[in-house]
Amino acid sequence: MKPAKVSLLRRLLHSLKHVDCNIAKRFPSTIKIVKLLMIFMVFTPISSIYAEDVYQNFEELKNNEDPSDYGVVTKETGSPVLVLAIHGGGIEGGTSEVARELSKEYSMYLFEGLKSAGNSVLHITSTHFDEPRALKMTGNHEYVISLHGYAEEDQQIEVGGTDRVRAADLVEKLQHAGFPAVLLNMDHPHAGVSPNNIANKSKTGLSIQIEMSTGFRKSLFGIFSLKSRAVTQNERFYEFTEVMFRFLKNSY
C-alpha cells in the first residue's frame, strides 16, 4: 500500500466529517456508499476507470514503482533508424519481441513492464514519456520506428507517424505480404503526429508509428504470455519482421 494512496484516502474520508449532520442522519446509507466509492477510486488504477495514465511522467513512475518491476534495454548499432518500444514487456505485449528482432540490424530503445500482473500502470503515453535515455537516443537518431499495441481482438495494423510518404509505402508492403495494414489519417488518435510525441523528437522529426491490435500480436506467438513470447515466435512473426527488415533496408 503506497503512502500517497493512504494519505489521499485519509483526506477524502476526513472531508466527509464536515458533511452536514442532518444529511448524514437522514441518509446514512448514502454516506456509506460514498465512502466505498472513494476507497474504490483510490485503489483502482486510474487507467481502468478513465483510460488515462497513472503516471504523467517517468519521474512519477520511478518514485512510486519498485525498480525490479520495469526495465530499460538499449542497443546502438550506428544506424540512422531507432526502433522505439516504450510500452514493452507486459504493457503492450509483443512489442518487445518485435523490437528485439529488429535490433539485430537497427538501434533500439525498449522500456518494459516486468510485473507478474498489472503492467498497465506502467503505461506513460507517448507525449509524456520522458525517460532520459529514451530522449537521448531519440535525439541522436535521424528517424524513429515506434512500436505500439492497442486493445482489439480483430487483427489489424494501424500505421501513422509524421513520415507520411514512408508510412504509406510500409502499408503497401505489408498489404502485399498479406498483413492487415491500414494508413491512418493525420487526425486519428493513433496517428502519433504530435510534436510532443517522443517518436517525433529525432533529428528530422520524421517517424512511423505502428499500432498493432491485440489480435494481431497474439497471432505472432505460440503462447502469448510475458515469459513465453520470447521463445514461441512463430512463422508469422518472422514473416512480419522480414517485411519490416526489407522495408527498412530499402527506405533509409
UniProtKB/Swiss-Prot annotation:
Main location per the UniProt record: membrane
UniProt-recorded Gene Ontology molecular function terms: hydrolase activity
Gene3D superfamilies found in the cross-reference section: Poly-gamma-glutamate hydrolase, zinc-binding motif
Keywords: Cell membrane, Membrane, Transmembrane, Transmembrane helix
One family name in Pfam for this protein: Gamma_PGA_hydro
UniProt topology in membrane: Single-pass membrane protein
Annotated localization: Cell membrane
Gene Ontology cellular-component terms listed: plasma membrane
Family note: Belongs to the UPF0714 family.
TM helices/strands, residue ranges: 33-51
Protein name (Swiss-Prot/TrEMBL): UPF0714 protein YndL
